[in-house]
Regions:
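Conserved N-terminal subdomain of the carbohydrate kinase-like
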Residues: 56-57, 78-87, 105-189, 353-359
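Conserved phosphate-binding/catalytic region of the ribokinase-like
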Residues: 1-20, 26-27, 31-32, 36-55, ...
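Hydrophobic anchor at the start of a short beta-strand
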Residues: 109-110, 136-137, 213, 272, ...
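Short gly/ser/thr-rich secondary-structure transition/capping motifs
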Residues: 43-45, 171-176, 215-221
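Alpha-helix/helix-capping structural signal
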Residues: 66, 241-242, 308
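Short, conserved phosphate/pyrophosphate- and ester-handling motifs at nucleotide-, phospho-/glycolipid
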Residues: 103, 239, 306
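Glycine-rich phosphate/adenosyl-contacting loop at the front of the ribokinase-like
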Residues: 3-4, 8-13, 18-26, 30-113, ...
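Conserved beta-alpha-beta core of the PfkB/ribokinase-like small-molecule kinase fold
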Residues: 190-259, 280
């Protein structure tokens, strides 16, 4: 699905009686172009018959953090208590938002459940979601709230010297907020969550969401929130240290990684994709286990590889792919992401991903 098609579907979902002329005016395109897009959506099965009857269950919900990253890198040695000439960058991030962004690039319909303030940064995030075709209509806008912000200062070599993280607004992603959006969650093909949301909200998802639940542990500290709900998780994507925490198994070899995955399966997780860095990915479910090597290539930056991998796993599930193909999608997404300086490689697409997978 193209970004324009996703935008049209969102407008139709909000107003099933909308006319093609109204769609054209809302998107700034011609009526004939709208007709072509609607015809394509009908051929692809997203619109069933006349009257804009939308196919249900064909979307992914991402629950998690939205972040604005503000970074300053000095041109010379940092001088404390002084104004240092340098370069300042502002970029959009957050694990949940990054996963949603990658899924949109992979052609999936995405709905985002998150929270941000009614400040300039919140406006930037909302505009970005609209441009990408991510449905942010269910996002909680907090009056007077500050959109989650990460501020850091780096030296000329790019090493972080000091940082301040303001993610308090993520605490607004409460069980009551999720309950208000339960029908959206229940009708999804898959729900992906990070662990930036409160512990009780993760428990709510585990106990009330009937759609398959995919979890990105994010970090060892935040992964601990998943311990009480492992038995309700469909797909878990830990790295080595996160898997150690969740399984209680010390991992220093492939054999120990396999043991940790077995423990997690015994705890109720249906699928485990355990990253061992350069040693590859161990994918396991009850009746199948395998190793998939990383794809060698030019590495520019590894930032964002985990987020794209989580998106690739959700994409693979939505496309009906098996365990091995999902694992190959995981490593393929990482190889694409690391080729760009940006956290999200704008070249990401389902065509490129499948090519990298060897399909």
């Amino acid at each position: 699905m193209t970004q324009r098609e996703r935008q049209i579907l969102q407008l139709i979902a909000a107003n099933p009686m909308i006319s093609q002329q109204e769609l054209a005016e809302a998107l700034g395109i011609t009526r004939s172009s709208v007709g072509v897009h609607i015809s394509n959506l009908s051929k692809k099965g997203y619109i069933a018959g006349k009257g804009y009857v939308l196919r249900s269950g064909s979307y992914c919900v991402v629950v998690g953090g939205v972040n604005v990253d503000i970074g300053g890198a000095s041109f010379g040695a940092l001088v404390p208590a002084d104004s240092n000439p340098g370069h300042v960058t502002v970029s959009l991030g957050g694990v949940g938002r990054n996963i949603a962004h990658n899924l949109a690039l992979l052609g999936q319909e995405v709905k985002l459940l998150s929270a941000f303030g009614e400040d300039i940064h919140g406006q930037q995030v909302a505009a970005s979601c609209q441009e990408l075709g991510i449905d942010a209509s269910h996002v909680l806008r907090v009056p007077g709230g500050t959109t989650s912000t990460y501020l850091y200062i780096a030296d000329p070599q790019g090493e972080m010297v000091l940082a301040v993280s303001d993610m308090e607004i993520c605490n607004q992603i409460t069980p009551s907020y999720l309950a208000a959006n339960l029908s959206t969650l229940q009708n999804a093909q898959v729900v992906v969550t990070d662990t930036n949301i409160p512990r009780e909200s993760l428990v709510y998802l585990a106990e009330n969401c009937t759609a398959p639940l995919f979890c990105d542990p994010v970090s060892t500290k935040k992964a601990e929130k998943l311990l009480p709900i492992l038995h309700r998780i469909h797909t878990l994507k830990p790295n080595r240290v996160e898997a150690e925490l969740l399984s209680g198994v010390s991992i220093t070899s492939r054999q120990e990684a396999e043991k940790a995955a077995r423990v997690l399966l015994d705890k109720g997780v249906q699928r485990v994709f355990l990253s061992m860095g350069g040693q590859g990915i161990y994918a396991a479910q009850a009746d199948e286990q395998l190793w998939v090597d990383v794809i060698p290539g030019k590495m520019v930056s590894t930032t964002g590889c985990g987020d794209s991998a989580a998106a690739a796993l959700a994409w693979a599930y939505m496309e009906g792919l098996g365990l091995e193909e999902a694992a190959r999608a995981y490593v393929a997404a990482g190889s694409i992401t690391m080729e760009a300086a940006e956290t999200i490689n704008p070249a990401m697409s389902s065509t490129l991903l499948q090519s990298r997978m060897g399909l």
